[in-house]
Curated annotation (Swiss-Prot):
Name assigned to this protein: Bifunctional purine biosynthesis protein PurH
GO biological process, alphabetically ordered: 'de novo' IMP biosynthetic process
Taxonomy, superkingdom: Bacteria
Similarity field: Belongs to the PurH family.
Keyword flag Transferase: yes
Gene that encodes it: purH
Keyword Signal: no
Amino acid sequence: MNRRAVLSVSNKTGLVELARGLVELGFDLISTGGTFKTLTEAGLPVRYVTEVTGFPEILDGRVKTLHPRIHGGILARATAEHLQQLEDNGIGLIDLVVVNLYPFKETIARPGVSFQEAIENIDIGGPSMVRAAAKNQERVSIVVNPERYPEVLQALREQGEISYDMRKRLAAEAFAHTAEYDQCIAGYLTAALAEESVSSSSSPFPATITLGGQKAQDLRYGENPAQKAAFYRGADAAGTLAYGEQIQGKELSYNNWMDMDAAWGIVQDFSEPACAIIKHTNPCGTALGKTALEAYEKALAADPVSAFGGIIAFNRTVDAECAASLKAHFYEVIVAHEFSSDARAILQEKKNLRLVKVAQDGKPAHTPWKVRSIQGGFLIQEEDEGTTPISAWEVVSKRQPEPEELRELDFAWRVVKHVKSNAIVLAKAGQTLGVGAGQMNRVGSVKIALEQAGDKAQGAYLASDAFFPFPDSLEEAAKAGVRAVVQPGGSVRDAEVIEAADRLNLIMVFTNRRHFKH
């Protein structure tokens, strides 16, 4: 009796070539739906699944392969007892299962997709066959990745069978495939529930959670050479930085990815052309401009010493003029929505420079959570998305700000959100002038930012990611000539700090929203 293979795939890449090779090797093919149509149109002998089961498809195609004559043939072990049971029930063995699943991830990534349409793209029969075949790896081979087709055919041609070691590897890949698929579905449904519970007191976080991802590459090492590392893409994160395309340069490192994420997060908070230059996940220069070039030159001028070897992000296309200016300096990575052909030609001369473009196709569909590992577990929180609009700010000082001064403070406030706490940003004219990051006391960060700004602190605008516990930070700022301060407020000494602002003739506003970053 010929060996039998079930083929049921949504991704038709390499399908005909695989099926033709299996037929040449003496396999009988069983198939469903679009896969059956593709194979018959290619002139290949194939049996439709209902011919094998003797049972019609029902419920609009929801039930096709969920039948003992399919699952019995997959799950049976090569024991006398199992083989006798198959014979008694007219069931034939199935030796090879080739399945990939309904395109749920691609479906929910489409703009405007309905909840019902997403639900209909949840595969049931496919994962059932995948898991059955993977469980019975002792006898059955399961293939979920079209990239494996050539090596499967090669093994069958050269050895006459797929080795047990290879079957075990294929089974592990199959379970990872279904786990990622289920995680994508769970993430989508959880996000939908979170949206529904925004106005309720229920927690947006599920009682149990599985984190899924597909390994994109092994990295040379982690933060340090003694640490191994790898990069994984989330199952439901199309349109995000993780799905950006590297179009030039050396392989990205662990530290590159960390800094890219920090840089990309900053520029995405602005609608105007923006540029951020990052070192060790903190911005050493951030600026706005009428063009990408102007934003870059202002960001560079903010701290040209620290910018050396930095990671840069733009929320606009990098054109030739901007590329020519970038080329004059050493950077590790440049991230942008796009690079013009002329810009790429200019930057290609710096062969090691990594260029990454991230598609600008609307807001990506993903669960807005941040995950941090701790020893023995992990923490999950919502993304710190957006910030308090100017219209919701509270002016607490006697001195009142002009509209332009509020816009200056808004720029500093948007940047300070992305700086490690305790965080202070000095800015003016849409350009950071000094950044105090990661100090254990707030006045220490103020002093660092002021020292970095130097004389430019005169007339500058200061943002603090959290409240001032004492007036000392305002006193330091006023001595340097700072004009206005934006902070969340919320200290038990707010009244004392407000009194100091009035005494020092500072403008001060409260946003009533903190932006700690650890």
